[in-house]
Amino acid sequence: MPHLTSTKTSTSSTELRTGLGVPGYAHPLVAPAEWAELARPGTPLHWAVLDVADGPGARPDPHCLEAAGRLRNAGVRVLGRLDSAHGTRAYGETISEAQRYIDWYRVDGFLLDHCPTDRATLPEVRRTVTTLRAIRDNAHIVLGHGTHPHPGYAENADQLVTFSGSWSDYRWSQVSEWTADYPPDRFCHLVHGVPGPHLEEALRIARWQGAATIWFTDRTDRGGRVDPWETMPGYWDEIVSRIGTGVSE
């Protein structure tokens, strides 16, 4: 089973190779500075998600194509976002969207967002992942559960998002025991509402729980009314410096 592999951009100098996984900025026309920063040399990125219009959109978007190209040229892995709708999405729809991501934006893999977590849906997710790997050689697959799923999912993807939520929940979160059987580069944590003074604590939690790919931001979802991932964290330079130099370790 393939694990997280390095790109041309060095991800980190730490033993755990801690790096950033960007869940998806706003459209490049809305967030041009954010997309430009991701292509800056030396940024410790594991991957960045491209979400054109809740998926690949109905037609190619030249601005998204340009943004994705800049990231690839900088050695950053670009993932297309596919909404699994907690297992209710039709298999054919998912694969059709994936093919459009490949044809239009030459993505390196996929984030299956809102991925189900229970054992009963595991065969269908396995079927989807198998097809994604068939239509895109060496596809990097991230399953966006947002919580700890049935352990069987770990055998069907490169990485699992085992936490996605607020800082108030993250600071008291617990890790499932089965994750100790896998290296940290198999797990991702996405946390919003992390205050700047608590950034070091958040990095420490990720290290203790064994997650090498992270995304921490001080932006909040305002009670579910906004997307906290659409803009850059206020402490962007600090978190890049901490991860890039191994300070978090």
Model-derived segments and their meaning:
Residues 1-249:
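Glycan-processing catalytic domains of CAZymes
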